[in-house]
A protein has these predicted regions:
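Hydrophobic transmembrane alpha-helices and their helix-loop junctions in integral membrane proteins
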Residues: 1-262
Length: 262
């Protein structure tokens, strides 16, 4: 896809620069071998490479504005596939961005990668939160929730610091498990009612009590209610934002998450 092409091109830019710098060019493909020489990389080339990587792997992760494929894919795929897409594939793409994020900080400093991910993360949260209001399809609503939570991960990286990085990693894990449960439950609901339209789904407790109980757990987890894991990661996000980030951005994120939860 075009997104992967951008990510590959960004990776190749770093590889080509590394091959010219490190003593053994054959080791340029290994990030662990390249890291000690990060400060010798061309800053302009690294900024361009990081931009390509965010665009490329951000497309796979569903970050705004490369997120448009995600609701369609989730709504049309079988529920177990949607669970894998949201719980595993999106997080793998974000983990790739995390790897290059740390390397870019060592090469050009923290301001450029952090500011880029702050903006992309905040916009992903707000756009996804507002888009969820218009969705009647259960799986499309969950898909936009995935966009929002991937935005939270990007925002954590943008805030940076030990708390921000810890929040990003924890949110990857907790959201992966929670959203996997949510999509599996949506498949059970669709099987029981023959529809994904929220306007036509009523009385889940009477029709499928076990599914209803699991749905409540999934929704409480996605809403970041304590003691669920996403409460911990989002609490750390706000703590990191108050400690290291601009307060106006923390307010914007709080509003976006409030809209999404409601």
């Amino acid at each position: 896809t075009a997104g992967v092409a951008f990510g590959l091109f960004g990776t190749l830019l770093i590889y080509a620069n590394a091959a010219d710098i490190i003593p053994n060019a054959h080791e340029a493909a290994f990030l662990s071998c390249v890291l000690p020489y990060a400060d010798k990389f061309d800053p302009t080339l690294m900024r361009l490479a990081f931009a390509f990587i965010v665009i490329g792997f951000g497309t796979k992760a569903g970050l705004f504005p490369m997120h448009t494929w995600l609701p369609d894919a989730h709504s049309q795929a079988p529920s177990p596939v949607s669970a894998l897409l949201s719980g595993v594939l999106l997080k793998c793409a974000m983990l790739v961005i995390m790897r290059f994020y740390g390397f870019t900080i060592q090469a050009v400093g923290a301001s450029y990668p952090q500011f880029s991910l702050l903006i992309v993360g905040a916009l992903s949260i707000l756009v996804a939160a507002l888009s969820m209001f218009r969705q009647d399809d259960l799986k499309r609503r969950f898909a936009y929730s995935s966009v929002e939570n991937v935005g939270v991960i990007a925002l954590c990286l943008g805030i940076g610091g030990p708390l921000g990085i810890a929040a990003a990693l924890l949110h990857c894990v907790f959201h992966g498990f929670t959203k996997t449960l949510a999509f599996c439950v949506s498949g059970n609901i669709q099987h029981a009612f023959g529809t994904r339209s929220l306007a036509k789904i009523h009385g889940v407790v009477e029709v499928a009590p076990a599914t209803a109980a699991l749905a409540i757990l999934a929704l409480l987890g996605l809403a970041a209610f304590p003691p669920f894991g996403m409460f911990i990661s989002e609490f750390l996000t706000f703590a990191a934002g108050v400690t290291a980030g601009p307060m106006w951005l923390v307010v914007v994120v709080a509003l976006g998450l409030t809209v999404a939860i409601s």
